Every structure is written in C-alpha cells, then in structure tokens.
C-alpha cells in the first residue's frame, strides 16, 4: 500500500494538472485509510483460551458535558466477538458464555470501573456456541478524556462433557482518546454499561 501511495504522488507530480487531482486524491484516501487501520489496530486485542477466541475493538463515540461541577466524561463503544474454534467431537465442542468480568483503567493505569467476575451473561443473554459458531455484541463504557484501557474475562461453561467452566481471557485493549482531545485533561467516574 505504501508503494501505491508513493506511486500516485509521483504520478500526480508528473501528470498534467487535470490528471493529477484524481491521482493525488487516491493517494490521500489511501493514507487516511491506513491511519484508520492503524488506529483500529491500536484499539483492538485478541486472545484464545481453550479454543475460545475473543476479539475486542473499541472506538470513542462521545464527549459528555460536565454536569453540576462534575468532570466531563468520554464514552467508548466496544465490540466483543466470541468464536468457538473447537472442532466437532472435541470435549469443548459445545459452549455457553455464562458470565463476564471487566476492569477499566484510566490512562495512568488507575482503576476506573469494574464489573466483578461472575456477573451474569453478556448484554442480557447467555449465548450457546457450537463448533465454528460466533457471537458478537456491542456495549459501552466511559472514562476520562485521556482514555485508558479495558480487559476482562468471559465465564464459559462446557455443555457436552464434565468440563465445568473456565474463564476465557479478553486481552487488554485501548480506549483511545479522539485526536482533537488528545493531551487535554479529563477525569470522571464511570462504569461499564452492561
């Protein structure tokens, strides 16, 4: 992609003015796309526990105005995708997500919000996942203007055997501040909204 961008800039410089604009527009669009991909990568994580793959991605969605002397809050949405990568016939072939636990830290690494491990379900449900099944949900949390990070665990019950339950890790992912707000102060108290 970098070579494509460079080629379009070079071609735009050598082209007639009428032909240069589309080439330069394409190069700039590719650069914006790369920046967006880099930001998404920085706010994503993936972890696999006993064949359960948990992918997480977050995005800043809003800055809330302070209310009655309280500091302003910023809200992030996050997407969690849980995939059962266990093959048919394996001991962990049929699974159910039964609980969750979250730790949200501010940009300095201080605890900001917590959902205790064992809190029932995810977004009001306890999905069952057969082999190759996937369940995806969206939720939100708040944090100060500087952002922070989030990590946790999903309690998973094995349905087909005496496998009991285990915790599937949700690897730490960033709550990145919006570019216009980066470097500004912020604080606030908040909670994960599930």
Language model features: what each stretch is:
Residues 73-79, 150-151:
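Short, solvent-exposed loop/turn segments enriched in Ser/Thr/Gly
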Residues 1-55, 184-194:
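Intrinsically disordered, low-complexity, basic-enriched segments
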Residues 57, 79-83, 103, 140, ...:
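Residue-level recognition of well-ordered beta-strand positions that form the cores
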Residues 58-76, 88-93, 126-131, 142-145:
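Short, solvent-exposed beta-strand/turn "edge" segments of beta-rich domains on protein surfaces
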Residues 1, 22, 29, 60, ...:
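Long, contiguous binding/interaction regions
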Residues 88-112:
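Short acidic, flexible loop segments centered on an aromatic residue
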Residues 140-194:
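Terminal connector regions
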Residues 109-147:
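Intrinsically disordered, low-complexity Pro/Gly/Ser/Thr-rich segments with frequent PxxP/GP/PP motifs
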């Amino acid at each position: 992609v970098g070579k494509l961008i460079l080629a379009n800039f070079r071609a735009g410089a050598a082209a007639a003015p009428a032909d240069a604009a589309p080439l330069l527009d394409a190069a700039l669009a590719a650069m914006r796309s790369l920046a967006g991909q880099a930001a998404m990568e920085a706010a994503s994580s993936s972890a696999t526990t006993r064949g359960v793959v948990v992918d997480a991605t977050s995005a800043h969605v809003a800055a809330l105005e302070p209310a009655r002397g309280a500091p302003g809050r910023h809200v992030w949405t996050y997407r969690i995708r849980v995939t059962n990568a266990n093959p048919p016939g394996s001991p962990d072939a049929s699974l159910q997500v039964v609980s969750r636990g979250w730790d949200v830290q501010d940009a300095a690494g201080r605890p900001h919000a917590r959902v205790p491990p064992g809190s029932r379900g995810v977004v009001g449900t306890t999905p069952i996942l057969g082999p190759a099944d996937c369940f995806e949900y969206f939720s939100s949390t708040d944090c100060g203007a500087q952002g922070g990070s989030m990590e946790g665990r999903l309690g998973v019950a094995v349905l087909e055997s005496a496998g009991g339950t285990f915790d599937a890790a949700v690897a730490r992912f960033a709550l990145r501040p919006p570019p216009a707000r980066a470097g500004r102060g912020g604080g606030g108290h908040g909670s994960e909204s599930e």
